[in-house]
Amino acid sequence: MGKKRRKHDGSGSSRSPSPDRIREARNPSQAEVAGFRAPPSGKPAMTVKQLREERQKLLHEHFGYSNTNNPFGDRLLAEPFVWKKKNQLLQAAGQKGKTTVAALIHSSKSKVQEIENVKRRREEREKEEELMQQQREELQREKEREHYEEYAQKEELFHRSNQLKKTEIRLEQNRAQLIDLIVKGLRIIKGERFEKMDVLPGPPHEVLETYKNEPVTVAMLEDLIADVKLHIDVDTTVVDADFQDFWKSLLVLAREALERAKKRKDVLDQLARNSSPQMAAEAAAQLADTVCPQIRDADTGIVLSVAHEIEGLLGGKSAAELDELEAQIRSKFEEEDIDVAYWEGILNKIPSFRARAVCLQTWHMMTQSAADAEREMAREKALKEEEEAKAARAKGEELEGLLLEEADARKLARAQQIKQDAIKVARSVEKDVNPNADGSFSPELEPYDEGEVPPPVRGPYSPQLWPFDEFRHAEILAPDDDEDRRAILKKTLIQKERLKRAGLEEDPEPTPEAAENDASLDVLDPAAKVTTYEEFVKKEKKNLEADEEVMASSSEHKLTMHYTWEEKYRPRKPRFFNRVKTGYSWNKYNTTHYDHDNPPPKVVQGYKFNIFYPDLIDKTKAPTWFLEPSDTPDTVIIRFHAGPPYEDIAFKILNQEWQLERFRGFRNVFDRGIMQLYFSFKRYIYRR
């Protein structure tokens, strides 16, 4: 605002000058060119054409540009530029001097030089950037190389660990391969123990030819070589770090066995293609290694008879002796007049025999270590069985003492009860005979203490009076028979409990006498007979209803508790056999969308818990159960508590209301050592 637009005359420049004006500005007039005079040296003046040619020459030499060929599309690139307005202003101000040709040429050359410098700096900068890019790429390649090496190491370690796992799996499944038995033998040498201490059935150089009475195939040997390479030059495991010499020697033997197996396979294939008698004879000779002695050995270049002599020379030497022999032979090569072929043949055979010696020595170590380990394991097993037998005997003696104490306590309580009853009866009789009696006993009716012998009296006397209810439903026995029967029952009970504790009790066919004793034992002590877990489970599985399923072990809720009696008794987990009652809920939705051919999903309708406590210390207290909150509102924890020596056990069940009526299936009983809790859930029927 407030600025006035500048007026331009016809001779002035504008924002968008026309091409004619540009050309006019570029092409100097004759008057302007007339100012280009020669210097005082007397050289002729340069014309506009010469100046134009000079500029074209400079552009072409330094840049390769011309008026027709340049990246700018300028057809007047070589024309000198004259700034007319500037010259007019300078001339009007009296500041314009003469423009010489030398100044124009110098200005053009300086600009060309400046452009060259800029171009050179740009090229240097591009070279620096290219060099830096190469350095960055090299650094990136170095990082990738390190990463790849790390990745390769991890991959190799992964393959090794997989190989060890496959070895362990094949050993567990009794389908061990050669590499598995070799690794197992080396681990036995290092002190590891296995259930079966079996190693290679023979020396490695023999097993590589025949394994399990069959020739070792090419595929088996190739797999063995690949597995052996995984154990060379590594220290992943103990069998790798301490047996490198063995693995390298085994690789040598495996490669030789592979070559022989391939030759044997080629001979058999050739024989299969051509079964002529001559070919069969040649094949048999090659397979038996009984070719003519005049044929030279392909490996050593010596006669086979001499080769057999060399094998006899090297066969019985150890690895150290073979190393010493190799050093001596190499020193012989410096001497003159020696059979080079013979000694080179020996040198070629030494690595094979050295590998055989190393593997044979390691195999002897395997067999010896396995035998020692078996003897040690047998001795440990015998000691363990002896300790278990001692513990069982001690436990049986302890149980026998407890049972005897319990029997004596019951007998004493029974005697005291009989004495008290006799006193009551005697007092009632005395009251009936003499109403004025003061409650004291007469000499005839005074009861005697246990163990007290009554004094001899003359004439008849009254026996102790027993209540009649004691004998209403009992079997009357003679005193001697009663004592004998009680002694037999006690002995039977002690023997059965002792065998049961020791884990030696079997289930023989019950005899009539044993059945009678068991029945009498139930009468004597109903809580003494305990149903075993196996008997109960066998019976319950037979009676399993169609809508019942055995509760999964995952329903058990783990508890972490400490008990005050842990120092006296070793806590044990009770055994259980629980069932889940399932069924279909035929509500309105299910009846609409399902039928009996396509039923809805089953839902839990109840539970049946059977917890076994056969060895409770205090059998007078029945186990109890508690309901505790769970981690979800739809479930609840039911915990069973019995006391020593049993831990508490808990299960996660659905949080629904129970039916507590007996005719609805509710059962809460502790009988014969089994805590039984049966219940069903209430069913809600909604009506409009």
Swiss-Prot record:
Q: Which GO terms describe its biological process?
A: cell differentiation; mRNA cis splicing, via spliceosome; mRNA splicing, via spliceosome; positive regulation of G2/M transition of mitotic cell cycle; protein homooligomerization; regulation of cell differentiation; regulation of gene expression
One Pfam family, please name it.
Answer: CactinC_cactus
Q: Where is this region: Disordered?
A: 1-49, 431-454
- List where this protein forms a coiled coil: 108-182, 248-275, 365-406
Cellular localization per UniProt: Nucleus
Keywords of this protein's UniProt record, alphabetized?
Cell cycle, Coiled coil, Differentiation, Nucleus
Query: What is annotated about its quaternary structure and interactions?
Result: Homooligomer; the oligomerization requires the C-terminus.
The protein's role, per its UniProt record: Plays a role in pre-mRNA splicing by facilitating excision of a subset of introns. Involved in the regulation of G1 progression and stage differentiation of tachyzoites. May play a role in gene expression.
By what name is this protein known?
Splicing factor Cactin
- Recorded source organism is Toxoplasma gondii (strain ATCC 50861 / VEG)
